[in-house]
C-alpha cells in the first residue's frame, strides 16, 4: 500500500508549518512583555503610594511678598479715605486741604499700582481690600487722624520691611518700599503744615505729583526731575 506524502497542504493535525512556530514564539514574547510592563506599572504605583508627599518648594520672596501686599493694602485704604476727606474739605470751603487730600489720594493710588506690579513680578498676586470704613468729622479732625496714622505706622514698621527685602538681595522691592515709606512721612509733614495754617490761610499753595512714583510736592518751584524716579517735571500732575 502506497503511503501518501505529507506536505503543507495535506499535513495531518498536529503537524505545523514553520510560520506557525514563528507566530507562537511572537505571541509568547508579547505575553512576556505585557507581563513585564504590568509588573513595572504595579511597582511604580506601589512606590508612588508609599512615597512620602513632596513638599512644595517655598518661594524665596515669601516675606517680601507679604510686606508688599501689606503696603498695597495700606495705600489702597488711604487713597479711598483721602478722597472722602477731600469731599468733606470741599463742603467746608477748605480748598487747600481739599487739593492736598486729592493729591495724596492720587499719589497713594500710584504707589499701590507700583507695589502690585512688584508683587506680580515676584510671582505673587494681589487683591485690593473690599470693605473700607469711611470716617466723617471735620477737616481738622481728619487731618489730625491722618497725621497720627502716618506717624504710628512709621514707628511700628521702623523700616523693617525694607531691611528684609535688602537682606534677601531684592533691591527692586526694597526701592518700592523705601519710596512708600518716604512718601508716608512726606504726607504727614504736608498735613501738619495744612493743619497749622488753618482754614483762614491764603489759598495759594499748589501740589504736584510725579505720575510714575507718586512723589508729592507743595511748591511753585519744582525739581527739574523727580529725585525718586527721574521723571521730568513737565509730566507732574498739578492739584
Task: Cite the ranges covered by each PLM segment.
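N-terminal hydrophobic targeting signals that begin at the initiator methionine
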Residues: 2, 24-25
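Polybasic, lysine-rich low-complexity intrinsically disordered segments
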Residues: 2-3, 10
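Non-heme di-metal
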Residues: 25-239
Amino acid at each position: 500500500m502506497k503511503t501518501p506524502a505529507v506536505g503543507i497542504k495535506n499535513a495531518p493535525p498536529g503537524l505545523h508549518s514553520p510560520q506557525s512556530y514563528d507566530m507562537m514564539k511572537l505571541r509568547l514574547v508579547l505575553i512576556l512583555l505585557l507581563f513585564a510592563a504590568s509588573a513595572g506599572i504595579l511597582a511604580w504605583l506601589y512606590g508612588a503610594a508609599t512615597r512620602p508627599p513632596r513638599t512644595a518648594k517655598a518661594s524665596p520672596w515669601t516675606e517680601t511678598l507679604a510686606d508688599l501686599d501689606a503696603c498695597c493694602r495700606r495705600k489702597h485704604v488711604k487713597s479711598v479715605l483721602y478722597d472722602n476727606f477731600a469731599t468733606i474739605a470741599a463742603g467746608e470751603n477748605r480748598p487747600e486741604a481739599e487739593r492736598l487730600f486729592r493729591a495724596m489720594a492720587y499719589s497713594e493710588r500710584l504707589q499701590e499700582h507700583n507695589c502690585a506690579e512688584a508683587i506680580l513680578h515676584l510671582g505673587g498676586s494681589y487683591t485690593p481690600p473690599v470693605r473700607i470704613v469711611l470716617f466723617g468729622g471735620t477737616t481738622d479732625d481728619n487731618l489730625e487722624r491722618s497725621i497720627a496714622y502716618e506717624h504710628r505706622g512709621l514707628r511700628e514698621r521702623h523700616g523693617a520691611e525694607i531691611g528684609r527685602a535688602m537682606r534677601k538681595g531684592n533691591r527692586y522691592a526694597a526701592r518700592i518700599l523705601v519710596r512708600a515709606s518716604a512718601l508716608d512721612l512726606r504726607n504727614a509733614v504736608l498735613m501738619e503744615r495744612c493743619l497749622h495754617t488753618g482754614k483762614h490761610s491764603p489759598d495759594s499753595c499748589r501740589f504736584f505729583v510725579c505720575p510714575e512714583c507718586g512723589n508729592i510736592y507743595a511748591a511753585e518751584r519744582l525739581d527739574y526731575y523727580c529725585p525718586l524716579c527721574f521723571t521730568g517735571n513737565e509730566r507732574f500732575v498739578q492739584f
